[in-house]
A protein has these predicted regions:
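Acidic, Ser/Thr-rich low-complexity segments on the non-lumenal side of membrane proteins
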Residues: 2-34
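Tandem CBS (Bateman) regulatory domains
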Residues: 1-3, 16-21, 38-92, 97-123
Length: 123
């Protein structure tokens, strides 16, 4: 089981960029509410649309992508991969039946699965 962290919609863009994204070398994050419910995905590239002097007063919820249906635990890698491509994100949230974020699929984890399948199938 891998560690994953989320950010709060109330977090400032400055906190997301300087305290989450750059230290973790992760340019996107899943946004949740206080109960762990999925809210959206925030991207450093979208922070670039906001003047940097406003980063400390602009919330992640103001710039996050909200039009996503999070993945369920029963979904296949192919289903999640298609949604990631459609959304233009490198990460995708996975939620339980109550809508709480329980994990994150990354583009790198999908590459790892595909490479593993190729190796085990003699590809």
């Amino acid at each position: 089981k891998r560690e994953f962290r989320t950010v709060a919609g109330t977090d400032s863009i400055a906190d997301f960029v300087w305290q989450f994204a750059f230290p973790r070398k992760q340019l996107e994050a899943v946004v949740t509410d206080d109960d762990g419910q999925f809210q959206g995905i925030v991207k450093v590239s979208d922070a670039g649309d906001v003047d940097q002097d406003q980063w400390s007063t602009t919330r992640c919820s103001d710039i996050m992508i909200q039009e996503l249906s999070p993945a369920r635990l029963s979904w296949t890698v192919r289903e999640v991969s298609a949604l990631m491509e459609e959304a233009g994100t490198d990460i995708y949230p996975v939620v339980d039946t109550a809508g709480r974020v329980v994990g994150v699929v990354t583009d790198q984890s999908i590459v790892n699965v595909v490479e593993l399948l190729d190796e085990t199938q003699g590809g």
